Amino acid sequence: MKVAVLGAAGGIGQALALLLKTQLPSGSELSLYDIAPVTPGVAVDLSHIPTDVKIKGFSGEDATPALEGADVVLISAGVARKPGMDRSDLFNVNAGIVKNLVQQIAKTCPQACIGVITNPVNTTVAIAAEVLKKAGVYDKNKLFGVTTLDIIRSNTFVAELKGKSATEVEVPVIGGHSGVTILPLLSQIPGVSFSDQEVADLTKRIQNAGTEVVEAKAGGGSATLSMGQAAARFGLSLVRAMQGEKGVVECAYVEGDGHYARFFSQPLLLGKNGVEERQSIGKLSAFEQQALEGMLDTLKKDIALGEDFVNK
């Protein structure tokens, strides 16, 4: 199984590469690409870690050598948020980067499963889909927006609030991956109940957690380490499912039946070819139902922005 990380010299990319080097199954190949000249050196650095994962690094304008034979491609390339920016301010720079990289994927490894980490995910996934469609290689079961950071944050914050072990809490998060489009389904956590105020406060904290990190880093970056962990969790789940492990479920942002929006994050059963089954979002509380209805306009606008960027 070959995994390629695009944007591997950045804060997320390096953290992700480290976790994949130490956690991918024995015999896997890890391929690192970034425009930055340091990238082959990042691979050399990681190659000294004693695991049975072969690693190579590539830099420059052309990602082709890194993509050849890739089964999974994780895209973390792009600029990070600074204080005062929201994820959509990133659009102008990151849209072009994602478009370019996905065009190269469409040429070199069109069968690969793709996980898009680059923000704004609500929009960059739509860009990726349209690029793949234009190239005639789009498979909606193989393109994912990685929203796992919202899930791990939810797990952490709920565990803190309720005095539970963070490893025992699993919160489904649906919708999108910015602001009001992030909807943690707090009503669906077994054996945990919340007051209305706790639900309102927790939901808001989960939605604004990225800003919390941006502000705490005081202009020195955004959430890179927790995002690296989240992306690794998603990538490793995908690899395990593609290698035949049964019952692997992760939430991610994918094209579904369009019931809520063309792209929507929901629980997915993963399999050998990506998404095996889009699972139901289950029964929502009144608060969740209202939040869901309230986000759809924003989500649809974010998606249209990406579609128009490719098709204009």
Swiss-Prot record:
GO cellular component: cytoplasm
Pfam families, A to Z: Ldh_1_C, Ldh_1_N
Glycoprotein among keywords: no
Keywords: NAD, Oxidoreductase, Tricarboxylic acid cycle
Active-site residue numbers: H177 (proton acceptor)
GO MF: L-malate dehydrogenase (NAD+) activity
Amino-acid positions noted as binding substrate in the UniProt annotation, renumbered to this chain: R81, R87, N119, R153
InterPro entries: L-lactate/malate_DH, Lactate/malate_DH_C, Lactate/malate_DH_N, Lactate_DH/Glyco_Ohase_4_C, Malate_DH_AS, Malate_DH_type1, Malate_DH_type1_bac, NAD(P)-bd_dom_sf
Catalytic activity: (S)-malate + NAD(+) = oxaloacetate + NADH + H(+)
Ligand binding (NAD(+)): G7, A8, A9, G10, G11, I12, G13, D34, N94, I117, T118, N119, M227
EC number: 1.1.1.37
Keyword Chloroplast: no
GO biological processes: malate metabolic process; tricarboxylic acid cycle
Function, in words: Catalyzes the reversible oxidation of malate to oxaloacetate.
Quaternary data: Homodimer.
NCBIfam families: MDH_euk_gproteo
Family: Belongs to the LDH/MDH superfamily. MDH type 1 family.
Stated name of the protein: Malate dehydrogenase
Organism (species): Klebsiella pneumoniae (strain 342)
Chain's gene name: mdh
